[in-house]
From Swiss-Prot:
Residues 427-504 are annotated as: C-linker. InterPro entries: CLZ_dom, CNG_cation_channel, cNMP-bd_CS, cNMP-bd_dom, cNMP-bd_dom_sf, Ion_trans_dom, RmlC-like_jellyroll. SUPFAM superfamilies: cAMP-binding domain-like, Voltage-gated potassium channels. Residues 147-177 have a biased composition (Basic and acidic residues). This is Cyclic nucleotide-gated channel alpha-3. The record marks 411, 415 as: Central gate. The gene is CNGA3. Residues 645-688 form a coiled coil. Residues 113-177, 685-706 are annotated as: Disordered. GO terms for molecular function: calcium channel activity; cGMP binding; intracellularly cAMP-activated cation channel activity; intracellularly cGMP-activated cation channel activity; protein-containing complex binding; sodium channel activity. Residues 317-425 are annotated as: Ion conduction pathway.
């Protein structure tokens, strides 16, 4: 009976004890063998011995402790040497966190066992008396049992690290969200808010400074409004400091850079000056001096910015420009009226005929009369329409001269701006009317019938009434191709998807076709196509009613409405079609109809880049013809159409002619250049033989001089 020196008493079982120890050694060896072995050369002899012994054991099939003991011990020594060498010369490497995300449960369990085996083998704990004589096997058994707990702890640590990595990103996003985009709706709404206190200060500060009753009778109201405006001014500085700007096409979102950029602009200086607390002088001078707050007028740029943004956003820019111009004129007249009343107060009311009448008169002592009289005088002076009392003193003459100059500028501005606005508003109508006039003259010159002339004029009236006179290509030509494509997709893509043969096409082909759709408008009674005509276009009905009629043009078979389409088979040029590319029906417009047209040439040009889509479209068209029994199978299998071959040959001949022409031109240029080079070489040879310098370097002799 095999005995093991341990302090515990065990039953006399030989094979189970050997198996358990073998299993423990396997756990250790499997764990340590997964590590890198830098000292494999030093243990090669032991490995050879182990290999010989394992071969003998495999043949004999013996599993006793006496026969396998040396082999197990040798393996254990090799594993310990490899581990100690790696531990001394190489640091522990943490597995890649990115790869750990893709590990399965088995790989994670194996890796956890590795780490625990290495840890327990490397620990130099003194053996206890109550423990087994195989501490390594005991340690390995314990680590295998505790692997799940360690895996959970590792997962928790990884989650914490990932959260720490994600938290800065979230904080950066929060910081970026505070930055305001100057092209966003939020920024425009803030401009609307800040424009109110700016407009309030520009209109009422000067009025309160000139008319004392207005300031004294509503003092609390003005204090509330003034300091509310100051709060908005302060908030506007914060908004400006957090407003992004473009740098190399990208929006700058860094708060420190935004603040530095803002402090370097003129707006920052004006904003600071507009918030200087000059109204603290109220405590010394009194509350009836609102002119102390005139520094709040430095915020005028915000009002102009609001007007500019509104002009670009509104759908009626011409009307907005006219209203904006009238507002500027009213503000100038308002300021001029207040200054006139202030000058009259400085000179003395009623001292002469030019100043404001004496306020001792109850009729002229009212606040409303004071302002209206001053406004009336200012309007007459600036518009130079009516007559006003002549000035008497030098100060009055100087003020009137300045008013006349300002009035002339205002009058010129009004005439110029209003004239240009009206011309811009009527530009489209004038251009459209010019087209009608030219067509009328042509029809009169060619003596067109009255019926046809009436139809033409009605067609033009329909276009103008329904705002369909806009040339889309002319309007969109200034846009880049990307924006053109997006507008066309937004307008026409849903319409094109209704066509049966285009429903499963790839998006790139649909975009190409959308850009090639052309609008077409037909009058009542117009034939879109007739039976037997060559089909060069397909049509999609956007709005209106079309009728499939008989040869007489009256009998209606089918009425086509919005979203219907026809002619899609004829532009595909499918082989074996019984009708060829001919129209098979008469289609007539019942009323005014708006259609989209796609030509055969445009379709084929788009399909050159999509050969697979071309095959798919032809197959769909062939299936449609087969359902309607409109395809000849023999012709379809016969091969290429002779007409197509003739067209290709003609195209090749044309290309060959153009290439020959280009080659002849290039050959002539080459011969001419070669001739010039030969002449130049001959001249140089003759000069060298005669011993003369080249022409450009020949000195002028006295004989050559005049």
């Amino acid at each position: 009976m095999a005995k093991i020196s341990t302090q515990y008493s065990h039953p006399t079982r030989t094979h189970p004890s050997v198996r358990t120890m073998d299993r423990d050694l396997d756990c250790i060896e499997n764990g340590l063998s997964r590590t890198h072995l830098p000292c494999e050369e030093t243990s090669s002899e032991l490995q050879e011995g182990i290999a010989m012994e394992t071969r003998g054991l495999a043949e004999s099939r013996q599993s006793s402790f006496t026969s396998q003991g040396p082999t197990r011990l040798s393996r254990l020594i090799i594993s310990l040497r490899a581990w100690s060498a790696r531990h001394l010369h190489q640091e522990d490497q943490r597995p890649d966190s990115f790869l750990e995300r893709f590990r399965g449960a088995e790989l994670q369990e194996v890796s956890s066992r590795e780490s625990h085996v290495q840890f327990n083998v490397g620990s130099q704990e003194p053996p206890d008396r109550g423990r087994s004589a195989w501490p390594l096997a005991r340690n390995n058994t314990n680590t295998c049992n505790n692997s799940e707990k360690d895996d959970k702890a590792k997962k928790e640590e990884k989650e914490k690290k990932e959260e720490k990595k994600e938290n800065p990103k979230k904080e950066e996003k929060k910081k970026d969200s505070v930055v305001m985009d100057p092209s966003s709706n939020m920024y425009y709404h803030w401009l609307t808010v800040i424009a109110v206190p700016v407009f309030y200060n520009w209109c009422l500060l000067v009025c309160r400074a000139c008319f004392d009753e207005l300031q004294s009778e509503h003092l609390m109201l003005w204090l509330v409004l003034d300091y509310s405006a100051d709060i908005l001014y302060g908030m506007d500085m914060l908004v400006r400091a957090r407003t992004g700007f473009l740098e190399q096409g990208l929006m700058v979102m860094d708060a420190s850079r935004l603040w530095k950029h803002y402090t370097q602009t003129l707006h920052f200086k004006l904003d600071v000056l507009s918030l200087v607390p000059t109204d603290l002088a109220y405590f010394k001078l009194g509350m009836n001096y609102p002119e102390l707050r005139f520094n709040r007028l430095l915020k005028l740029a915000r009002l102009f910015e609001f007007f500019d943004r509104t002009e670009t956003r509104t759908n009626y820019p011409n009307m907005f420009r006219i209203g904006n111009l009238v507002l500027y004129i009213l503000i100038i007249i308002h300021w001029n009226a207040c200054i006139y009343f202030a000058i009259s107060k400085f000179i003395g009311f009623g001292t002469d005929s030019w100043v404001y009448p004496n306020v001792s008169n109850p009729e002229y002592g009212r606040l409303s009369r004071k302002y209206i009289y001053s406004l009336y005088w200012s309007t007459l002076t600036l518009t130079t329409i009516g007559e006003t009392p002549p000035p008497v003193k030098d100060e009055e003459y100087l003020f009137v001269v300045i008013d006349f100059l300002v009035g002339v500028l205002i009058f010129a501005t009004i005439v110029g701006n209003v004239g240009s606005m009206i011309s811009n508003m009527n530009a489209s109508r004038a251009e459209f009317q010019a087209k009608i006039d030219s067509i009328k003259q042509y029809m009169q010159f060619r003596k067109v019938t009255k019926d046809l002339e009436t139809r033409v004029i009605r067609w033009f009236d329909y276009l103008w009434a329904n705002k369909k006179t806009v040339d889309e290509k002319e309007v969109l030509k200034s846009l880049p191709d990307k924006l053109k494509a997006e507008i066309a997709i937004n307008v026409h893509l849903d319409t094109l998807r209704k066509v049966r043969i285009f429903q499963d096409c790839e998006a790139g082909l649909l975009v190409e076709l959308v850009l090639k759709l052309r609008p077409a408008v037909f009058s009542p009674g117009d034939y879109i196509c007739k039976k037997g005509d060559i089909g060069r276009e397909m049509y999609i009905i956007k709005e209106g009613k079309l009728a499939v009629v008989a040869e007489d043009g009256i009998t209606q078979f089918v009425v086509l409405g919005d979203g219907s389409y026809f002619g899609e088979i004829s532009i595909l040029n499918i082989k074996g079609s019984k009708s060829g590319n001919r129209r098979t029906a008469n289609i007539r417009s019942i009323g005014y109809s708006d259609l989209f047209c796609l030509s055969k040439d445009d379709l084929m040009e788009a399909l050159t880049e999509y050969p697979e889509a071309k095959k798919a479209l032809e197959e769909k068209g062939r299936q449609i013809l087969m359902k309607d029994n409109l395809i000849d199978e023999e012709l379809a299998k016969a091969g290429a159409d002779p007409k197509d071959i003739e067209e290709k040959v003609e195209h090749l001949e044309t290309s060959l002619d153009s290439l020959q022409t280009r080659f002849a031109r290039l050959l002539a240029e080459y011969n001419a250049t070669q001739m010039k080079v030969k002449q130049r070489l001959s001249q140089l040879e003759s000069q060298v033989k005669m011993g003369l310098p080249p022409d450009g370097d020949a000195p002028q002799t006295e004989a050559s001089q005049p």
